[in-house]
C-alpha cells in the first residue's frame, strides 16, 4: 500500500510538466500568431500538430488509467499524425518557421512525457530523463553560450535519430528487462549524438 501511494505521489510530477507545456505552447501560438503560415491563417498542418499535442498530453495520465499498451497506441497515433502534418504543410503550402518550431516543440514534449512515464511508472532510473531533457538543454545552451549561432535546421540524421529514439522508448514501454532497457539506451545514445552534431553545426554558423 505504501509503495502504491508513493508511486501515485510521484506520478503527480507529470502533471506540472503537462501544465507548463500547455502554457508555453499558448505563449508560442500568441507570439507567432502573425506568422502561422505564408497566408497568415493557422493552417491545416498546424491544426494537425495541435491535435498531436492534445493526444500526447494523455501520457501524463496515471498508470492506473493508462497502461503501457494504451501509451504505445497514443505514441503510434502521434507519430502517424507527425507524418500527416508534414504532408499537409507541403500539400497546402502551410510550411513556415512557426510551423517548424511548433512541430519540434511538440516532438520534444512527446519525448519528455514518455521518459517521465518510463521513470515513474515503468521502473527505469532517473537517467532515462536525459533523452527527454536534451532538447531543452540544447535550446538553453544556444541562448546562453557566447558565440553560438541560430538553431540548425533539423537534418535527415536528426529525423532518423528521433525515429530511432521513439522506437527505443516504445521498447522500454512494452519489452521486459534488459530488452526494453537496451532499446532505451541505444535510442538515447543516438539522439545525444544528433544533438551534439546540431550543436557543432550551430557553432559553425556563427
Regions inferred by a protein language model and the residue ranges of each:
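Short hydrophobic alpha-helical segments within the ABC transporter permease transmembrane module
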Residues: 93, 101-105
Amino acid at each position: 500500500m505504501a509503495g502504491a501511494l508513493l508511486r501515485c505521489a510521484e506520478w503527480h510530477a507529470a502533471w506540472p510538466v503537462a501544465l507548463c507545456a500547455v502554457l508555453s505552447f499558448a505563449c508560442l501560438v500568441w507570439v507567432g500568431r502573425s506568422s502561422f503560415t505564408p497566408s497568415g491563417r493557422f493552417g491545416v498542418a498546424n491544426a494537425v500538430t495541435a491535435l498531436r499535442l492534445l493526444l500526447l498530453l494523455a501520457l501524463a495520465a496515471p498508470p492506473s488509467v493508462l497502461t503501457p499498451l494504451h501509451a504505445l497506441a497514443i505514441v503510434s497515433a502521434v507519430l502517424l499524425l507527425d507524418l500527416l502534418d508534414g504532408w499537409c504543410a507541403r500539400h497546402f503550402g502551410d510550411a513556415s518557421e512557426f510551423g517548424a518550431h511548433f512541430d519540434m516543440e511538440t516532438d520534444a514534449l512527446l519525448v519528455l512525457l514518455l521518459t517521465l512515464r518510463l521513470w515513474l511508472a515503468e521502473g527505469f532510473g532517473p537517467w532515462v530523463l536525459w533523452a527527454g531533457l536534451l532538447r531543452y538543454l540544447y535550446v538553453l545552451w544556444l541562448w546562453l553560450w557566447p558565440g553560438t549561432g541560430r538553431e540548425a535546421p533539423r537534418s535527415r540524421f536528426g529525423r532518423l535519430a528521433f525515429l530511432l529514439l521513439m522506437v527505443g522508448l516504445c521498447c522500454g514501454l512494452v519489452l521486459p528487462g534488459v530488452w526494453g532497457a537496451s532499446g532505451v539506451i541505444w535510442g538515447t545514445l543516438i539522439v545525444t549524438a544528433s544533438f551534439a552534431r546540431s550543436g557543432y553545426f550551430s557553432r559553425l554558423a556563427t
